[in-house]
Amino acid sequence: VPYCPRCGTPLSAQEVAQGYKLVKEKSAVVRFKVAGEDAYFLAWTTTPWTLPSNVALCVNPNDTYIKVKAVDGYTYYLAEALADKVLSPLLSKEDKEAGKKAYEVLETCKGKDLEYKEYEPLYACAKELADKQGKKGFFVTCDTYVTMSDGTGIVHIAPAFGEDDANVGRNYDLPFVQFVNDKGELTAETPFAGMWVKDADPEVLKDLSGRKQLFDAPKFEHEYPHCWRCDKPLIYYARESWYIKETAVKDDLIRNNNTVNWIPESIGSGRFGNWLENIQDWAISRNRYWGTPLNIWECACGHRECIGSRAELAEKAGDPKAAEVELHRPYIDAVTIKCPECGKDMHRVPEVLDCWFDSGAMPFAQHHYPFENKEVFEQQFPAKFISEAVDQTRGWFHSLMAESTLLFNKAPYENVIVLGHVQDENGQKMSKSKGNAVDPFDALQTYGADAIRWYFYTASAPWIPKRFSGKLVLEGQRKFMGTLWNTYAFFVLYANIDQFDATKYKLEYDKLSVMDRWLLSKLNSAVAGVDDCLSNYKIPEAAKYLQEFVDDMSNWYVRRSRERFWAKGMEQDKINAYMTLYTALVT
């Protein structure tokens, strides 16, 4: 599972997807000595710290591999498609200009032909543990996950670190060697005891170089997952975890997603839809103290029970007080139940739930459903509309959909507006460390909440990233809010002078001037347009209707009707002007 050594807990695939960073670090191309032959497999890895746990190599069974005599004097096995890229750096500039070749091909074969070919273990500690387990290792395996895009076409296998490695390990019944503890430190069996895995990388490279088993250590730029909590690099680490088998309801997830009105549609069919098409089982357990305790009790005999309510807990514990216990650690951990299989005490497993599971339970958990408020829940579920940022396709949008599908087999929401992230005025991600983050409270104090809201309504479609610019906020404030305010101030000024009370009059449409009728027609069109746009979740389009109407009201109606407000007395034409403008403002 993806695992954070700093936090001491596994992460779900959804959490991992939120924390990828582009990193540039040294990889390793290693010489593995072929058993009984003066030749070496050139194998590549981006995680040198896993090499002490190596138990196999892997090739693609369908690709072509070659045995070559290289200009450095060594004989190598590697993929034909990558040989030039890997071996050409052995040539000097002069050799290249002279047309010399970096290697001579001795043999050609398919990857399948190399299967079970043995090599000498890279580290004695791995061989010792493999022997203790009575399992055979240190030979070439085959799997189509090996690609010809990077490296040598041969990868090293450590089943304890990585899903692909683990699959190969199971397929070939390889030894299980895990020389890293749960703190992310290499263990005492290795020459790198106590080192944090990333700190061990250069030491492993140094060690292999000293033994003449390091062919090269090229820098490799790639996306690497980091913990969303602490920002530390994750490792893929074999350990037990509790899962929800989402793969079993994949078709239901996809079908339910297709009933949702996604805005934009491309998120639902693309980013989120693709996520569901490739859904993995959800690792829901966390090795942490704080959180919702996993409601599973386990006996030493292997029997397990999942408790579904306080009443069930009290019944199986044989203690009525258990129904009132605080359902968090450490209190819940003290409650034991009798094992129906052997009669011994069963204890709660130590893990807590992924916090995203809590978020996905929100629609029913907030009402304590199904224990009470059944009618309230059924009236509100599914939600007519929700909105969150685009990263929540792997977060809240997913957890809601997963739990709703498992419990009710329908989508938990009908309409979703996906929001783009707010960036700085140069289009860069806001960061305190970069000094480009805008304090929202300072912005509210400077520009006002309504001006900021209006900026976000009108800047672009909701799903497009927004560049937050104080200048643009002020421009929108001046053009729209300032105009609206000035129109309101104009009305209040003359209404106070004339002591005009709109509640004492009614619009008499047959007595209205052409200008009055024009403004009311514009008003009705704006109301209809805004209502239609908001009903279809078209926010910028709705704002445009408002913006155009305020411009018509101020720069056309008021400017061309001012003399009617200035007139003496309270003639019908003046009343009509007041009532028309009043109606427009309050609507």
Model feature map: region roles:
Residues 1-52, 64, 72, 116-118, ...:
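Residue patterns forming the tRNA-binding/recognition surfaces of aminoacyl-tRNA synthetases
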Residues 2-22, 29, 498-528, 559-587:
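Acidic, turn-prone loop/beta-hairpin segments
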Residues 49-62, 68, 83-91, 165-173, ...:
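Short active-site loop/helix that positions an aromatic residue
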Residues 63-154, 163:
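Protease-associated
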Residues 101-145, 232-255, 343-371:
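Conserved oxyanion/phosphate-binding beta-strand-loop segments in alpha/beta enzyme cores
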Residues 172-183, 288-290, 307-308, 313-465:
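Alpha-helical recognition segments enriched in aromatics with Gly/Pro capping
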Residues 359, 363-367, 425, 458-459, ...:
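A short secondary-structure junction motif
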